C-alpha cells in the first residue's frame, strides 16, 4: 500500500521556501520604497529651508520698506517746511522798518506754515462751543457762562492732531454747571 499522506516536514519546508522567496522579492521593493521616502524627505527639507529663507527675506524687505516710508515721510514734511524757513529768514534780514510790510510777511509765513502742516495731516483743534472732550481738550478753568455745562467757552491754546491722533490737547475754559 502506498502512503498518500504528505509528510508534514515537507509541507513546512515548502512553506518556508515560499516565505523566503517572498521575502527576497519584497526586499528590493522595500528598499525602493525606503529610497523613495528618503528622497521625498530630502526634497521636503529643501523645500522647507527655501520657504523659511523666503519668509525671512520678505520680513526683512518689509522692515526696510517701513523704515524707508518713515524716512521719506519725514523728508516730505521737512521739504514742506523749507519755504516757511525761507520766509522767516527773509523777515529777519529785512531792515526796512516798515511794520505793515513786516506784518504782511508774517501773515504770509503763517499761511505757509499752516499749509505745510495740513500737508503733513496736522490739524488745529478750535473747540469753542463744543462739548468738552478730555481726549482732545485740557480744562484749565471753569467759568459761569450762558452755555450748557461742560461746553468749551474759550480756547487759551490751540490743540493739534495728526491723522486723528492728538499731538497736543487744546487748553480750554469750560462752562461750569449752573
UniProtKB/Swiss-Prot annotation:
Residues 1-31 are annotated as: Disordered. InterPro entries: GrpE, GrpE_coiled_coil, GrpE_head. PANTHER family: GRPE PROTEIN (PTHR21237), GRPE PROTEIN HOMOLOG, MITOCHONDRIAL (PTHR21237:SF23). Pfam families: GrpE. One of its GO terms (biological process) is protein folding. Keywords: Chaperone, Cytoplasm, Stress response. Residues 19-31 have a biased composition (Low complexity). Its main location: cytoplasm. Participates actively in the response to hyperosmotic and heat shock by preventing the aggregation of stress-denatured proteins, in association with DnaK and GrpE. It is the nucleotide exchange factor for DnaK and may function as a thermosensor. Unfolded proteins bind initially to DnaJ; upon interaction with the DnaJ-bound protein, DnaK hydrolyzes its bound ATP, resulting in the formation of a stable complex. GrpE releases ADP from DnaK; ATP binding to DnaK triggers the release of the substrate protein, thus completing the reaction cycle. It comes from Burkholderia thailandensis (strain ATCC 700388 / DSM 13276 / CCUG 48851 / CIP 106301 / E264). Belongs to the GrpE family. HAMAP family: GrpE. Homodimer. The keyword Cytoplasm applies. SUPFAM superfamilies: Coiled-coil domain of nucleotide exchange factor GrpE, Head domain of nucleotide exchange factor GrpE. GO terms for cellular component: cytosol. This is Protein GrpE. It is found in: Cytoplasm.
